[in-house]
From Swiss-Prot:
Entry GO CC: cytosol
GO molecular function list: RNA binding
Organism: Lachnoclostridium phytofermentans (strain ATCC 700394 / DSM 18823 / ISDg)
Record key words, sorted: RNA-binding, Transcription, Transcription antitermination, Transcription regulation
InterPro entries, alphabetized: NusB-like_sf, NusB_fam, NusB_RsmB_TIM44
Annotated coiled-coil segments of the chain: none
Name of the molecule in the record: Transcription antitermination protein NusB
Length: 132
């Protein structure tokens, strides 16, 4: 599984989380993995660990995004854009293995694929403030 595929899975897992109660999270993650055609137990474990790490830092991530997005409240942002930025912010601030430029570029690519017409530029603008 490539890093891009890992990011896409993590984005989908974060996005899915938005529509379920916290008590259903574990079950929803299992449903997500069941929906995938080919994923090894090792890949599933890796995704689980990364997903858990992101969730552990979610409060800090949201604070960083709120500070970077003056004029925008997180609860008013599109769920696609928000979760792409959460993933990228985790990589930028808490994952030393991912270069900042790569995290931003990958977030822009996810925004182009899953977001609306202005998502890529919106995500880019907010993430530029995250790295300042």
């Amino acid at each position: 599984m490539t890093r891009r595929e890992i990011r896409e899975h993590l984005f989908r897992m974060l996005f899915r989380k938005e529509f379920h109660e916290p008590t259903e999270l574990e079950e929803q993650v299992l449903f997500y993995f069941d929906s995938l055609e080919s994923i090894t137990p090792e890949q599933q474990e890796y995704l689980n660990v990364r997903f858990d790490k992101i969730n552990e830092k979610l409060g800090e991530i949201d604070t960083i995004l709120a500070n970077a997005s003056s004029g925008w409240k997180l609860n008013r942002m599109g769920k696609v854009d928000l979760n792409i930025m959460r993933l990228a912010t985790f990589e930028i601030r808490f994952d030393d293995e991912v270069p900042v430029k790569v995290a931003i570029n990958e977030a822009i690519e996810l925004a182009k694929k899953y977001g609306g017409d202005s998502s890529a530029s919106f995500v880019n603008g907010i993430l530029a403030k995250v790295i300042d």
